[in-house]
Curated annotation (Swiss-Prot):
Keywords: Cell cycle, Cell division, Cell membrane, Cell shape, Cell wall biogenesis/degradation, Glycosyltransferase, Membrane, Peptidoglycan synthesis, Transferase. It is found in: Cell membrane. Pfam families: Glyco_tran_28_C (PF04101), Glyco_transf_28 (PF03033). It is a peripheral membrane protein. One of its GO terms (cellular component) is plasma membrane. One of its GO terms (molecular function) is glycosyltransferase activity. It comes from Staphylococcus aureus (strain NCTC 8325 / PS 47). Its EC number is 2.4.1.227. UDP-N-acetyl-alpha-D-glucosamine binds at R166, S196, Q290. Its main location: membrane. It catalyses: Mur2Ac(oyl-L-Ala-gamma-D-Glu-L-Lys-D-Ala-D-Ala)-di-trans,octa-cis-undecaprenyl diphosphate + UDP-N-acetyl-alpha-D-glucosamine = beta-D-GlcNAc-(1->4)-Mur2Ac(oyl-L-Ala-gamma-D-Glu-L-Lys-D-Ala-D-Ala)-di-trans,octa-cis-undecaprenyl diphosphate + UDP + H(+). This is UDP-N-acetylglucosamine--N-acetylmuramyl-(pentapeptide) pyrophosphoryl-undecaprenol N-acetylglucosamine transferase. SUPFAM superfamilies: UDP-Glycosyltransferase/glycogen phosphorylase.
């Protein structure tokens, strides 16, 4: 029986692809295990949503693009992580490693290479992240979500596969969504998602604009951990820090979304044909990958995008109003998108690429 080790973490985006793939792997008769950090979000998500597979925590450092004394400490954490990962891989003897990226993945990929275990990397963003750039030297193949990403990668190692979307995405129950929120079925629903870390600025602007927004929408506000404001209570407005199992039901009642521009999330909105206003993480908080993703989706006619630095209460309302006027055009553009690979076909390709 083929055994696949999965790794990736640090953000929800670095875990969600694995969460979508592992159930398919298990249903096809593959064995699966997960290697991640000791305290990262990946541990919480994998252990709670896939308790049937083994989770192995390892030491991990953070990859920084700036000079810091912490970089020296993290070198030792990465070295320890390589040793930790080697122990796991020697014990489990997987046939291949699938790496979604994030800083925890680098020591695992290096350890796999030292044991001659082939690695397949997945890159969700338009431009490759630092972890995947490093890991690519030790990997056999890298799969991309965006076809344009191939321009940044060695031709012999890179293949475009499109987005991988979790199976339950389209199974959301609108009735359950309305019951959860207590919303009126005859009024539009706006979903606001600030990413796994939340966005204090976006949260502030939503609350500042709440009365105006509630004239047109009912609002589901995913604030991020620790960012709920218990003092804000209005009819047609509900806050959650983070939603797991119920998210598909909330998406089933969503008409419009305001969101960060992580690749996995925006491809889910695209699959569901939900018009989106994207507010990507700025260069002060990231390497600019979300800016690239947002601009790409805007250019394709799937979304509208605005830089967080330019975001004001007035501009938010203006952009939403313009998007509502273009709603039919946006949804028609979304209908042209087709998924490149089924998950079953992707695993066939993965096994062939890794083991041949």
């Amino acid at each position: 029986m083929t055994k696949i080790a999965f790794t990736g973490g640090g953000t929800v985006g670095h875990v969600s692809v694995n969460l979508s793939l592992i159930p398919t792997a298990l249903s096809q008769g593959y064995e699966a295990l997960y290697i991640g950090s000791k305290n990262g979000i990946e541990r919480e998500m994998i252990e709670s949503q896939l308790p049937e597979i083994k989770y192995y925590p390892i030491s991990s450092g953070k990859l920084r693009r700036y000079i810091s004394l912490e970089n020296a400490k993290d070198v030792f954490k990465v070295l320890k992580g390589i040793l930790d990962a080697r122990k796991v891989l020697k014990k489990e003897k997987p046939d291949l490693l699938f790496s979604k990226g994030g800083f925890v993945s680098v020591p695992v990929v290096i350890a796999a290479k030292s044991l001659n275990i082939p690695t397949i990397i997945h890159e969700s963003d338009l431009t490759p992240g630092l972890a995947n750039k490093i890991a690519l030297k030790f990997a056999k193949k890298i799969y991309t979500t965006f076809e344009e990403t191939l321009n940044y990668l060695p031709k012999e190692k890179a293949d475009f596969i499109g987005a991988t979307i979790r199976e339950d995405l389209k199974n959301g129950n609108a009735h359950n969504g309305y019951q959860l929120t207590g919303f009126n079925e005859n009024k539009k629903v706006l979903l606001v998602m600030g990413g796994s870390l939340g966005s204090k600025k976006l949260n502030s602007i939503i609350r500042e604009n709440l009365d105006a927004l509630l004239q047109q929408y009912q609002v589901i506000h995913l604030t991020g951990k620790g960012l709920k404001d218990a003092q804000v209570k209005k009819s047609g407005y509900i806050q959650y820090e983070f939603v797991k199992e119920d998210l598909t039901d909330l998406l089933a009642i969503t008409d419009t979304v305001i969101s960060r521009a992580g690749s996995n999330a925006i491809y889910e909105f695209l699959t569901l044909r939900i018009p989106m206003l994207l507010v990507p993480l700025g260069l002060d908080q990231s390497r600019g990958d979300q800016i690239d993703n947002a601009n790409h989706f805007a250019d394709k006619g799937y979304a509208k995008a605005i830089d967080e630095e330019q975001l004001t209460a007035q501009i938010l309302l203006q952009e939403l109003n313009e998007m509502e006027q273009e709603r039919t055009r946006i949804i028609n553009n979304m209908k042209s998108y087709e998924q490149s690979y089924t998950k079953e076909a992707l695993f066939d390709k993965m096994i062939k690429d890794a083991l041949n």
